Amino acid sequence: MALNIEEIIASVKEATVLELNDLVKAIEEEFGVTAAAPVAVAGGAAAGGAAEEKTEFDLVLAGAGDQKIKVIKVVREITGLGLKEAKELVDNTPKPLKEGIAKEEAEELKAKLEEVGASVEVK
């Protein structure tokens, strides 16, 4: 090979933006690749966690209120649980009802539960 890595880097440093653009296109065509920027995989909520908008929410039943039977009926409707399981869930609050749902769905279900007297949190 006639050129070594240092010579290639020196040539790239001296090239104009248009020449570099042509080089990228030629490399893409020659080797069948694309020069797409790598996408970072979303990790845990580290330093940038506060800046990101939350997309998944948890619906937590905080209390049943005075109309426990109506709350149990709505909980059964939302979760698909049987009567016994829904009653246990309502009796042992705070308990999560649904996890990882969209904000719109969480707000809709919260309104439905608050309508029958339950206290609900969206986290």
Curated annotation (Swiss-Prot):
GO biological process: translation
SUPFAM superfamilies: ClpS-like (SSF54736), Ribosomal protein L7/12, oligomerisation (N-terminal) domain (SSF48300)
Domain of life (superkingdom): Bacteria
Pfam hit, one: Ribosomal_L12_N
Any one annotated GO CC term: cytosolic large ribosomal subunit
Family membership noted in the UniProt record: Belongs to the bacterial ribosomal protein bL12 family.
NCBIfam families xrefs: L12 (TIGR00855)
Listed name of the protein: Large ribosomal subunit protein bL12
Native species: Bacillus licheniformis (strain ATCC 14580 / DSM 13 / JCM 2505 / CCUG 7422 / NBRC 12200 / NCIMB 9375 / NCTC 10341 / NRRL NRS-1264 / Gibson 46)
